Structures are given as C-alpha cells and as structure tokens.
Amino acid sequence: MAPRAGLHRRLPVTVFPDATLVWCHRDPVTVMASFCSLIEHGMAVSSRPVDLAGIGATWLDLLSRAMTRGLAARAAIPPEQLVDAPYSWLGSDPATGAPKLHAAVGAPWTEADAARLPAAVARPKGTRRHTYDLSRYGLTRAEVESAFADYNALRAGADRA
C-alpha cells in the first residue's frame, strides 16, 4: 500500500473487508531522490526550464504530508490485516523475501513460484539503472529524515522484521 493510497478514497479495507494490505517500506531519502528524478524527466519534455530545487521543495512537502495522512489512516486498519514489508524483502533479497511475504499474507509459496522468480527479477540486458542524487534537487538527507521522522520510526520496526 502506498501511503497516498486512500487519501482521497475510502480505505481499501472498507471496500474489501477481508483484505490483507501490504505496506512496503523504503528509505525516504532514496525515495525522494528517485521521485524527484522521475518528476524532472517528466518535466524535461516541456519547453520550459526545469526548476530542480523547486521540484525538491514541492515534492518533499507533498510527499511528507501524504505520508502523515497515510500514517493517520493506518490507525484504522486492523493490525491483523496489515503486513509491513521492508523494501529489502523484494529489492535486495527476493529469494528469501518473496516467500516471507507470501507467508505473511497467508498465501502459499510453491515450487512453481520459486522457479519463476529468477526471470521475474532479472534485469533485461542493455538496460541502465536509474541513478539519482538528492542534492541535485536542493535537498539534504537531514531535511528528508526530519520531514519523515514519524514514518522512519515505523520503518525502523519494519526493517527489523
């Protein structure tokens, strides 16, 4: 579940009362740098100059407020219907993390799933990794960590899972 999910809609558990929601946790410093880069590249197709510091300031404000609302909405989700999944479960160690996530949501992990996993996580040949730098957008690690302090406290617990 992205923190912005349900901010302008009903919570998914009110529509699907038996649902189990997965909240994937990732370091906001990494997310902000990546997100700002995405916005920059999207804006670069226009003929107007791109204000990199403006992108950083605007999206730090918007995303940190969205996270605050997401954390408040989270309180309405029954704990047994919410799985906190560190990004590392799927990002850096999917062979361990994918079965762990399946177990957490009560889904079986089969030999067929395990056999399909390498192809699902393989990077196609010739593709470039997305690279980004927080400072390019006029932001510092300290600013982002401060803006997401409440979320980082929650994420610290999820990362120990």
Feature annotation, model-predicted:
Residues 2-4, 28, 89:
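Short, flexible loop/turn elements at secondary-structure junctions
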